[in-house]
C-alpha cells in the first residue's frame, strides 16, 4: 500500500489535488505527450508486498448506485466500502473507466454514461474522489480499474458523446461486429493511455491502477490487418499483437511508478487464453520486472470442477500451473475467484445443488487452498454477488461469514 504521511501539509496538498480535476474539464482535448512510451521502469515496487484480499466493484454495480447527488452517492459508496472492509478485505478494484469514459473529470475521457445516463454529462460532483475518501476511511486501498481499449461493446453505452475518443480520434479506432476499440498498435494510443494514468495519479490519492483481461477483442486477422501491414513488421501477426500489448504494459507501469502507485492486471485464467486469445503475454509479465506489480488470473472454476471427466480447468490445477511459472521477485501472483458462481455453479459435470458452490463456504475454501499453495492472495468477482444477491441471499450470507473467518 502507499504510505501516507500524517502531516498537515500533506493533508492540505491531498485536499487540493482532489479539487484539481474540476479545473481540467472534459471538454479539453489533449494530444498524447511526446515522451517515449517505453521509458525505463523504476524499481523496486512502490508498495510492500502483503496478502491481496480484494473485491471488484464493476460498472454493473454502478448501474444500481445512486448518482443523483454527491450525498446520495457518498452514502452508497460508504456502505459498499464498509461491507468490503467487514470481510477482512484490504483492497477495492473500483471500475472508473469502463468504456472510454470516466467516473471523474478528465482531459482525456468524457464523464461516463453511468453517472447520469448520458455520456459526457457532468454529474455535478467527482465520484472517484468520493470513492477514494470512503475507501480510505475504512482502511482499504483503492485501485482505479481501467479498461484501456474498450470504447463501446454490445451497444453499451448506447450513444457516444462528441468527447469520446471514438469521435475525437476516429483513426485510432478499430471495429468488431459488436464494438469499438482503441487500436493497440497505435503509438499515439499507447501514449494517450499512459498520459491518462499520469492524470489519475496526479489528481487522486489512488493506491493502484488495475487492468482486467480485456486486451485484443478478437483473433480475426482483419481487425488490424491495415495496421500490421503499415508497421512493416517481419514477426507474425500474433507476436506483433503481443508486442503491442507489452509496449502498453511497460508504458503504463512506468507512468504509475513515477507516482509510487502500483500497477497490476487480472488476465484470463488460462495461459493459452491469455497468449493466443487476447495476445496478453502474462507469463512474460510474471517473469520479468517492468510490466506489473501483480497478476490476478481469473480462476472462476471450482476446486472440484470437471468437464467431460477432465479437471484441466479446476482451480487447483490452474493455480498450480500459474505458480510453477518463473516469477520475478517484485511481482505478486494472486487469483480471482468467481463469487458470481454462488448457487449457480461453474457448469462442470457436478454443477448443481450438490456442488461446492452450494455449500456456503466455496470462496473461503478456495482462498484457504490458494494460501496453502503459496499464492499472494485472492480477489472476488464481484461485490453484488455477495452483498446484493437476490437469487441466493442465504448462501451469500453464509459465504460472507466463512470469508470473515479466513480473512478477518
How would you name each of these model-derived features?
Residues 73, 83, 138, 166-288, ...:
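Polysaccharide-binding and catalytic clefts of secreted carbohydrate-active enzymes
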Residues 75-102, 203-208, 290-294, 372-377:
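Catalytic domains of carbohydrate-active enzymes, especially glycoside hydrolases
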Residues 104-117, 150-177, 213-233, 350-355:
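Aromatic- and acidic-residue-enriched segments that line the glycan-binding/catalytic groove
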Residues 289-315, 321-408:
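Substrate-binding cleft of secreted/luminal carbohydrate-active enzymes
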Amino acid at each position: 500500500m502507499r504510505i501516507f504521511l500524517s502531516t498537515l501539509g500533506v493533508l492540505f496538498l491531498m485536499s487540493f489535488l482532489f479539487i484539481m480535476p474540476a479545473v481540467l474539464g472534459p471538454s479539453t482535448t489533449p494530444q498524447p505527450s511526446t515522451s517515449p512510451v517505453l521509458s525505463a521502469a523504476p524499481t523496486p515496487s512502490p508498495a510492500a508486498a502483503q496478502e491481496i484480499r480484494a473485491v471488484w466493484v464493476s460498472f454493473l454495480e454502478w448501474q444500481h448506485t445512486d448518482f443523483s447527488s454527491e450525498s446520495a452517492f457518498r452514502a452508497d459508496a460508504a456502505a459498499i466500502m464498509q461491507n468490503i472492509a467487514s470481510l477482512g478485505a484490504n483492497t477495492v478494484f473500483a471500475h472508473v473507466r469502463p468504456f472510454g469514459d470516466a467516473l471523474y473529470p478528465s482531459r482525456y475521457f468524457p464523464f461516463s454514461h453511468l453517472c447520469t445516463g448520458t455520456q459526457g454529462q457532468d454529474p455535478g460532483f467527482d465520484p472517484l474522489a468520493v470513492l477514494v475518501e470512503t475507501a480510505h476511511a475504512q482502511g482499504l486501498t483503492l485501485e482505479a480499474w481501467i479498461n484501456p481499449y474498450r470504447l463501446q461493446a454490445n451497444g453499451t453505452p448506447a450513444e457516444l458523446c462528441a468527447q469520446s475518443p471514438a469521435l475525437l480520434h476516429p483513426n485510432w479506432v478499430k471495429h468488431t461486429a459488436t464494438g469499438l476499440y482503441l487500436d493497440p498498435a497505435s503509438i499515439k494510443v499507447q501514449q494517450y493511455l499512459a498520459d491518462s494514468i499520469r492524470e489519475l495519479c496526479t489528481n487522486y490519492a489512488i493506491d493502484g491502477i488495475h487492468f482486467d483481461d480485456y486486451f485484443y477483442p478478437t483473433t480475426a486477422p482483419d481487425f488490424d490487418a491495415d495496421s500490421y501491414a503499415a508497421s512493416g513488421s517481419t514477426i507474425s501477426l500474433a507476436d506483433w499483437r503481443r508486442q503491442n500489448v507489452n509496449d502498453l504494459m511497460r508504458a503504463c507501469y512506468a507512468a504509475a511508478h513515477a507516482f509510487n502507485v502500483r500497477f497490476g492486471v487480472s488476465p484470463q485464467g488460462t495461459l493459452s487464453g491469455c497468449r493466443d486469445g487476447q495476445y496478453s503475454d502474462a507469463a512474460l509479465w510474471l517473469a520479468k520486472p517492468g510490466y506489473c506489480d501483480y497478476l490476478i488470473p481469473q480462476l472462476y472454476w471450482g476446486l472440484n470442477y470437471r468437464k467431460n471427466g477432465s479437471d484441466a480447468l479446476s482451480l487447483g490445477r490452474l493455480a498450480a500451473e500459474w505458480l510453477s511459472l518463473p516469477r520475478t521477485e517484485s511481482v505478486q501472483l494472486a487469483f480471482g475467484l468467481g463469487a458470481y458462481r454462488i448457487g449457480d455453479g461453474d457448469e462442470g459435470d457436478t454443477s448443481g445443488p450438490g456442488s461446492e458452490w452450494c455449500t456456503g463456504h466455496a470462496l473461503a475454501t478456495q482462498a484457504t487452498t490458494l494460501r496453502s499453495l503459496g499464492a499472494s492472495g485472492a480477489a472476488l468477482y464481484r461485490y453484488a454477488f455477495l452483498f446484493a444477491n437476490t437469487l441466493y441471499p442465504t448462501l451469500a450470507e453464509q459465504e460472507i461469514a466463512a470469508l470473515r473467518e479466513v480473512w478477518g
